[in-house]
UniProtKB/Swiss-Prot annotation:
UniProt family annotation: Belongs to the class-I aminoacyl-tRNA synthetase family. GluQ subfamily.
A matching Pfam family: tRNA-synt_1c
Protein's name according to its UniProt entry: Glutamyl-Q tRNA(Asp) synthetase
Signal peptide: none
E.C. numbers: 6.1.1.-
Residues that, per the record, bind L-glutamate: 25-29, 61, 188, 206
Binding site for ATP: 247
Motif ('KMSKS' region): 244-248
Organism for this UniProt entry: Yersinia pestis
Biological-process GO terms, alphabetical: glutamyl-tRNA aminoacylation; tRNA modification
Amino acid sequence: MVQQAVIQRSANQRATNQPTEYIGRFAPSPSGDLHFGSLIAALGSYLQARAQGGKWLVRIEDIDPPREVPGAASRILAALEHYGLHWDGPVIYQSQRHEAYRATLNWLEQQGLSYYCTCTRSRIHQLGGFYDGYCRDRHLPASGAAIRLRQTQPVYAFYDKLLGELHAHPALAQEDFIIRRRDGLFAYNLAVVVDDAFQGVTEIVRGADLIEPTVRQIALYQQLQHPVPGYIHLPLALNNQGNKLSKQNHAPPLPNGDPRPILIDALKFLRQPLPEYWQDLDLYLLLRYAVKHWTLVSIPLQGAITPQKTQRHSQSKYGEL
C-alpha cells in the first residue's frame, strides 16, 4: 500500500534522528558566474547556519558537463570568498562523486525500486506533463534507456520553515521520476540527495524555484532510509520583466569591487536589520552583525525586483553573461 508522507514541523517527529550539530550548505552549478539572485541563496544559507552556530558547506554541482562554463567553478568560489562567505571543510565536486551515485543506483535496483524507461519527452508532454508509469513493468534492457525511481512513498506535502506547509500536485508526488538520464548522466535529484546525506546536511536553505523537486527529494531520502533535512525556500530576485534572475536570463555577475554595498542590498532584499552606520564597518563586522540579527520572520514570502543600483553597477562594470 502506498504510504502518504507529510513532513510537518514537529520536534518530536525528528527527535530520534536530529543531529546535535547544524549543517547547512550552498550548492551552485558552474553554468555561469554568481549573480545577485545566487548571492541571496548563498547569503541566506550562510546566515542561517552561522546563526545556529553550525557549519556551512559548499558543493559544486558539476554533473551536467554540457551546461558548464569553463572556469565558472573557480570564479564562484572566488566570489564567495570576496563577499566574506567562507565555508567549512573541503569543497565537494559532484563530478568526483560518480562512484557514490552508481552505488546508490545499484542498491535501488537490488531493492526493486528502479527500472529502465524509454519514454520520450514528447510522449510525456502529450500525457499532460506527468509520466504515467508506462515502462514500470515492461522489464526493458538498459540500452538507450533512462532509469526511473519506482515511487513507493509519494510525498504530498512538506513543511517549509519560512512558507509553512506546502502541497504538491498528486501526479507530481506519485510520479516515477528519472534518477539517471538516457544519456548516462546522473539526475539532479539523485545526486543532491546522495550528497546531502553524505555530508550530513540538516537543513537546506535555497531559492523558491526549487520548491517543486523537494517532494521528490524527500521521497528519495525515505526510500534510501536517510534522515530528511529541514527546508527553507527563500524568495527569488527578479529582473525588471518579473523573471527570475538567472544565468539563462543573462543576469550580470557580481562585481569585484567593495562587496559591502551589494551585501547591504541583499540584506535589504531579505528585510534584515541593518547597522545604522554600515559604511564604518569592515566586511567581517558587517557579516558578524548580520549573523547576530538574522531572523526568518522578516523575510518576505514572495520574490521582488532586484535593486536597480545593483543591476546598473554589475552591468556597467562587467557586462552580462
